[in-house]
Amino acid sequence: NPYRDYYIWKNPVNGKEPNNWGGAFGGSAWEYDNETQMYYLHLFSKKQPDLNWENEKVRQEVYDMMKFWCDKGIDGFRMDVISMISKDQAFPDGEVKSGLYGDFGPYCVHGPRVHEFLQEMNREVLSKYDIMTVGETSGVTIEEAQKYAGEESGELNMVFQFEHVEDASPHAEFGKWTTDRYDFKAFKKTMIKWQEELQGKAWNSLFLGNHDQPRSVSRFGNDNPAYRETSAKMLATCLHMMQGTPYVYQGEELGMTNAYFHKLEDYKDIESIQYYTELTDAGMMEPDYMMKCLMLRSRDNCLLYTSPSP
């Protein structure tokens, strides 16, 4: 298959996965292919195999696709998990911090060639069009953000950082899966830091909600009917009075709140279902507590519940 090297394939190690990396949605980051008897890498869903950006043909295909849409007159690109396109080619095991699998972060996030690839993308495509670019860059620091979106970086216009939405429970054993209350002092400190330290160096993106987050009113405000509207106005004022480009997620303009589904079968989100199964089956979390976590933190709180088709 001429497109096989467009993806990342590895042989089994001792009859198992090439390393211990866990996927972002739960389970292993590797999927076994019976036909070829090899594993392919998918940091997210197994239906989303990672592209092999080390392959120059892959990069050129991406650039050609971007040019096609730019020529159609689009206004820009939001680049999903763009900070993860470069991998450590040794593919070492990751540290097992919680759960059953190792952390791929140190070997895939802000990888060794990511800035080289983005600078090439800028030369080949972005610099030739009047468009806006924003990159999703989980785990990005102030210093890294300046590399991605600095005035002289030659890469992107701005990035999404997630420090402010991850401030709720920095010591939570299982990451986002917690019922801990949000730490507003940490939120204030983080927002001030990003406002001050990017000033004159790079441009900020401003957001409280997106397709991966619960509803902002439920998380940062009070979704009790008596306080929902006031909370929504307070959050909108906070967001829009800062320097940067604000992003309003669908429903946020209405002050929409979490769904609070009480049964597992009501959830459709792959991340929620896989983590519920993984953590409860392993005895790491009680089912009742995990359901409370889903009600507060599941992505299904903000996703379209019905089919998006006409």
Name each model feature, range by range:
Residues 1-310:
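Active-site and adjacent substrate-binding regions of carbohydrate-active enzymes
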